[in-house]
């Protein structure tokens, strides 16, 4: 397929949001075909468009790519956001996995059972403050550059910014003790493509509300 990438997901962040972020940071316009009903999802499956009967799925360069990490790897490689050599890619992958682990922990809180929410929220705060943010503060200090890896923008900078914005929504006080991360957030947010994506009216999705959660439950049956 030629033209803009087409993203298939429902109208929420979920596991597609990091893909939206990376495309936007690369300056790539994309279209979205939103899944709004169980029938929409079933049609994608019956038409053979979902390799593992799961979304996210992205149509790009004649392919129908599934699996979030595979999609991110392809976009990062295509738009030169994956470092200059194997060593940089190894660091990018390592940092990205940690970022995605914490991101998943935070975004899953909105759909966890009420009787588990307090414990899982406490765990997420502890992991944020005592494991993940200290690790990335240390990376920025030791690397001494504007970016996490090398001396230019890579996918991991975008993933980290997205995470920091989630942390800020979750509990802004968690960022208080991390001056380098706060400076990083401001710096990456000021990049033209990123700044544009942060503006109202972009394809960036807001935090899920109760209505969206209920709609997602109906579509994905969780």
Curated annotation (Swiss-Prot):
Subcellular location: Cytoplasm
Subunit (UniProt): Homodimer or heterodimer of GSTA1 and GSTA2.
A Pfam family per the record: GST_C
GST C-terminal domain residues: 85-208
EC number: 2.5.1.18
Similarity comment text for this entry: Belongs to the GST superfamily. Alpha family.
Protein's recorded name: Glutathione S-transferase alpha-2
GO biological process, one term: epithelial cell differentiation
Post-translational modification N6-succinyllysine, affected residues: 4
One Gene Ontology term of the molecular function aspect: dinitrosyl-iron complex binding
Catalysed conversion reaction: RX + glutathione = an S-substituted glutathione + a halide anion + H(+)
A GO CC term attached to the entry: mitochondrion
PROSITE patterns named among the record's database cross-references: GST_CTER, GST_NTER
């Amino acid at each position: 397929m030629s033209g803009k990438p087409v993203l298939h997901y429902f109208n929420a962040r979920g596991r597609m949001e990091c893909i939206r972020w990376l495309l936007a940071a690369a300056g790539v316009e994309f279209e979205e075909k939103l899944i709004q009903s169980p029938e929409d999802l079933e049609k994608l499956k019956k038409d053979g468009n979902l390799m593992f009967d799961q979304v996210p799925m992205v149509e790009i360069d004649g392919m129908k790519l599934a699996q979030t990490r595979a999609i991110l790897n392809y976009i990062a490689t295509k738009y030169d956001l994956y470092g200059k050599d194997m060593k940089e890619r190894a660091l990018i992958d390592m940092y990205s996995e940690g970022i995605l682990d914490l991101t998943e922990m935070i975004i899953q809180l909105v759909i966890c059972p009420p009787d588990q929410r307090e414990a899982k929220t406490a765990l997420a705060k502890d992991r944020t403050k005592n494991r993940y943010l200290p690790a990335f503060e240390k990376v920025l200090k030791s690397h001494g550059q504007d970016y996490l890896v090398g001396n230019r923008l890579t996918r991991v900078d975008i993933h980290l910014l997205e995470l920091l914005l989630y942390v800020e929504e979750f509990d802004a006080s968690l960022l208080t003790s991390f001056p380098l991360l706060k400076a990083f957030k401001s710096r990456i947010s000021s990049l033209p493509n990123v700044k544009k994506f942060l503006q109202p009216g972009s394809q960036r999705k807001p935090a899920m509300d109760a209505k969206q959660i209920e709609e997602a439950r109906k579509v994905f049956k969780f």
